[in-house]
């Protein structure tokens, strides 16, 4: 099922209008945030940031995309958005090969496009806002290597082909390359359904001897809590689980000790800064949107805005839990 939400900016008084220096803005300026898996808490947080920026700038924000992991449905929403000729599009790319033509079509139509969360560097998008996913993988890989003492079998849960997840996997591989006794025995494609992670974890927990799995690594947000649940149900306490993102369930599993650590991202910031950047571009359009600004040393646009990552474990989980509670 596809969901679409709309924020209409509230009219302001002339005095406030002048005080906020927003005279150039209008609710007729429509910006889109497009992503797959909108039902995830991660995207609820990104939407909150996007809408907060829309409210601040007195513009209209629309959030569109499938509630589940469906790149084809995301493409349909992108095509609908391009046809509507909005002021700008912010998009998380579930499948670069599939979505690249739509992104390029938007740019060709004079619509600024910025990617967030998951990039499409081969497209004509202007730049990327989000996590340094290689660094995220390095953080997790270092913790796994430390906890395993440099030896053991590991299983990943991912959705191969999604650019940000592939980059995180590469980050882990970079670290494991210096620990040759850490073996990756599987990268499970959960296909957008965390239940696949649960089922596979149960099967891998039954393996013993040289096939024993010592660690489970979740490269996306939904798998962590179900992997932890599978481990808990079998009353196993000697396996390492590393998750992704800081939803309440994941933080609770860290407090419980079932999840060793998670890698935090800043989806609110991605949504907020994304709309802010689109607004600036819309009101100061370059001579050419299709130019490759990444190779221009004098470009007014960055290649990448890093919104930050951090490793969250028992030592700092309460800080993240309080922050989440403050923003509910």
Task: Place the predicted regions along the sequence by residue.
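Hydrophobic alpha-helical segments within soluble ligand-binding/sensing domains
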Residues: 74, 129-154, 166-167, 195-198, ...
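Hydrophobic alpha-helical
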Residues: 90-107, 172, 186, 191-253
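Hinge/cleft segment of the Venus flytrap/periplasmic-binding protein
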Residues: 175-176, 275-328
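Short beta-strand elements in bilobed, periplasmic/extracellular small-molecule ligand-binding domains
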Residues: 55-68, 153-158, 173-194
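Extracytoplasmic "Venus flytrap"
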Residues: 30-57, 61-80, 84, 92-96, ...
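Bacterial signal peptide processing site
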Residues: 22-25
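Flexible loop/hinge segments that line or gate small-molecule binding clefts
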Residues: 97-135, 142-147, 153, 247-255, ...
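Short, solvent-exposed amphipathic alpha-helices that sit
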Residues: 42-57, 136-140, 164-183, 196, ...
